């Protein structure tokens, strides 16, 4: 938002008939931005995972967690249940239909 004045609840009520029309407007604008590829902000969780992957922090934590699980004896059972690395997600795999 380029304006410096804050939007209050009263100002939003003047701009939109109901809170539902505001939500529908935001959803429509978001779909348009995604379709154009103009997404300036993204999911914070995905950004955090990318940051951790960039600096190799997450892989070190996963290796340490694996060692702790195997040392406790219950690690083999947990390791078998979680096949693959479910924490690492490729952000390019997400599209609008995944968001519910």
UniProtKB/Swiss-Prot annotation:
It comes from Chlamydia muridarum (strain MoPn / Nigg). Residues 68-91 have a biased composition (Basic and acidic residues). Residues 68-100 are annotated as: Disordered. This is Uncharacterized protein TC_0300. Belongs to the chlamydial CPn_0121/CT_031/TC_0300 family. It comes from the Bacteria.
């Amino acid at each position: 938002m380029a304006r410096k004045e804050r939007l209050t609840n009263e100002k939003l009520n003047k701009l939109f008939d109901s809170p539902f029309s505001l939500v529908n407007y935001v959803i429509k604008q978001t779909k348009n931005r995604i379709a154009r590829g103009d997404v300036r902000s993204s999911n914070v969780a995905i950004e955090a995972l990318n940051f951790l992957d960039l600096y190799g922090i997450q892989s070190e934590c996963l290796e340490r967690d694996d060692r702790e699980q195997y040392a406790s004896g219950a690690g083999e059972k947990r390791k078998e249940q979680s096949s693959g690395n479910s924490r690492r997600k490729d952000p390019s795999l997400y599209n609008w239909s995944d968001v519910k």
